[in-house]
């Protein structure tokens, strides 16, 4: 028996111990890395809306295809301890697993495959490249680049309930009105405004498994 039939998972600092766009920013030097990290922290604590920073960061970072491929490997290398095993057990109990992320889809898809999450259940921001792998832009229409975009996306999916959302940031916490529970994940980053609003607080995937499976 399961307590939740669907689980919506954040990626950066939840499924994997990396903030993808900040990692890409680090390739542009310490100053850009610090600037990007500051914006991420403020957005994840709900101090600034995500749409106020997303396009600006991407316009400066401008990741190449090869850098996205390198980031893909880092997502897998830094996967949260116990995540593979816990998610495999949830799948065995027919729990629907969904990734909803403000990260870059092409970098996240290999991690989804590694964790057994179907490609059509990965909601993230697509990035575009030219014939030589140079950055040409990102999907500016993506709901993931907007405040409350995750909430809208999850609502439109009409997942089988009860539904649990899991994440470390305010953009994850904001899903709460359209799901049945929200778990703040603190295994990589603890953000007090998120913890204060959470129904549950977990710091590892064994706890997630116990929460979902009765």
Identify the function of each model-found stretch.
Residues 2-126:
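Alpha-helical substrate-recognition element adjacent to the catalytic core
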Residues 83, 147-150, 169:
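Amphipathic coiled-coil/heptad-repeat helices and related helical stalk/stem segments
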Residues 84, 88, 155, 173-174, ...:
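Alpha-helical segments flanking ligand/cofactor-binding loops in enzyme cores
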Residues 91, 113-116, 158, 177, ...:
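Anion (oxyanion) recognition and catalysis
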Residues 101-102, 161-198:
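Acidic, Mg2+-coordinating phosphoryl-transfer loop and its flanking beta/alpha structural elements
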Residues 109-162:
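Substrate-recognition "cap/lid" segment bordering the active-site pocket of phosphatases
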Residues 200-207:
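Short acidic-hydrophobic, aromatic-tinged amphipathic segments that line or gate anion-handling sites
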Residues 210-214:
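Short amphipathic alpha-helix with an adjacent loop that forms part of the alpha/beta core around
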